[in-house]
Amino acid sequence: MKPILPDYNSAGVLIIGDVMLDRYWYGPTGRISPEAPVPVVKVENNEERPGGAANVAMNIASLGGHAHIVGLTGMDEPAKVLTETLNSLKVKCDFVALPEYPTITKLRVMSRGQQLIRLDFEDKFENTDAEPVLSRMETALPSVKAVIMSDYAKGSLEHVQAYIQKARAANIPVFIDPKGADFERYRGATLLTPNMKEFEDVVGKVKSDQELVEKALALVEEFEFEALLVTRSENGMTLIRRGQEPFHLPTQAKEVYDVTGAGDTVISVLAASVAAGKSFEEACALANAAAGVVVGKLGTSTLSEIELAEAIHGSQDTDYGVISEQALIEAVKKARAKGEKVVMTNGCFDILHAGHVSYLNHAAELGDRLIVAVNTDESVKRLKGPGRPVNPTDRRMAVLAGLGAVDWVVPFSEDTPQRLISEVLPSLLVKGGDYKPEEIAGGKEVIAAGGEVRVLNFEDGCSTSEIINAIKGGKG
């Protein structure tokens, strides 16, 4: 199955669970300590990332969804860092601050790509009051279409049954990343995402696919779940539902560097996709593709909507289609080595019309390869105002990539593509409209590198704004 990306901007997701701050210290090791037989790390860099349930929220936001997170923290510096970081990513934070506890923090010391030690700063939350979380749920539920509960057994989900009942009473599906062998506490949830070890901790050793399906169905019946999605590492993932055939997906991972946070990514993409209107099968296929991307990254990682689109459409073949900036730069190098002339243009291309197609055909005729750089949704909104774009980035890029004239489609988030153009440095930069070559973003850089800048005419009578106005006016 090769699913189509949904509009994640329509996906509101509430995340409840164990929030953490992941800290990383990086540096070389060149000697052994004289005090003990351990390496000495000269710390040269550090990094802070939201982890646990906070990483789930960050994944939702990275996809373009609307994340609202509720969790327990201390009243300390890590809680402040978490809140500021998540707010900067447009995640709505609604933490319950408990002064007698520290915010869960994990410090990893890294050298040469290897983790040398992890230090955990935490106390399990116990005998907490459910009401502060329930009241926050009451406020959040009307604006979400899915609830994720991220359980790391740190105590934030001590009252998980009350939270499940609250969400289900509002007809909101509940997706749970479980911890531990007690699935009774998750009774009535919509879907659980245990990994193979977690699954076998509950049902015992599984020796075949058939046995996995039978034991999973027994759990679904016993605990009144709608489904289980068992993630099976190199064996992919299997969706088991009552009254339906099992749905299996092979792994899409090319290389595995770090599985930290992979479960967070699976449940994030799964729930956000369902919230955006996808079926369980389609949502699982998207989650499987996402997992294949993040295990190739180091540390707790998110992925963007663009990376997910590339994973689905096979971005390893960089001859054509939607492509990342780094992959584009490499593809352009290969094209130049073959003596191909690279042409580049840019625009919003919100509603593709005949004028756009004519313009792009003309641009393609001027060289061997045509790159189209596309403004992301936030960039379009800043340039065009409220109500734009009509079509989200992934859909605009998919339509452009389907045109025979276009070789590569790449997004950019700035107001102009000047930085991107200066990285790519095409042989020919073209722009449609009433411009002078020196006024075109990136033109100076292209000319300085020995390239050319040209202005092409748009076909008269074609305008995205006119099309939108006609639709609003009920014409045509």
From Swiss-Prot:
Q: Under the GO molecular function aspect, what terms does this record hold? A: ATP binding; heptose 7-phosphate kinase activity; heptose-1-phosphate adenylyltransferase activity; phosphotransferase activity, alcohol group as acceptor
Q: What are its E.C. numbers?
A: 2.7.1.167, 2.7.7.70
Please provide the record's keywords in A-Z order.
ATP-binding, Carbohydrate metabolism, Kinase, Multifunctional enzyme, Nucleotide-binding, Nucleotidyltransferase, Transferase
Give residues annotated as binding ATP: 195-198
> Highest taxon of the source?
Bacteria
Involved pathway(s) = Nucleotide-sugar biosynthesis; ADP-L-glycero-beta-D-manno-heptose biosynthesis; ADP-L-glycero-beta-D-manno-heptose from D-glycero-beta-D-manno-heptose 7-phosphate: step 1/4; Nucleotide-sugar biosynthesis; ADP-L-glycero-beta-D-manno-heptose biosynthesis; ADP-L-glycero-beta-D-manno-heptose from D-glycero-beta-D-manno-heptose 7-phosphate: step 3/4
Q: In the UniProt record, does the keyword Cytoplasm occur?
A: no
Q: Extract the PROSITE patterns matched here.
A: PFKB_KINASES_1
> Which residue ranges are recorded for the region named Ribokinase?
1-318
> HAMAP family recorded for this chain?
HldE
Q: What is this protein called?
A: Bifunctional protein HldE
Q: What is the protein's species of origin? A: Vibrio campbellii (strain ATCC BAA-1116)
Gene encoding this polypeptide? Answer: hldE
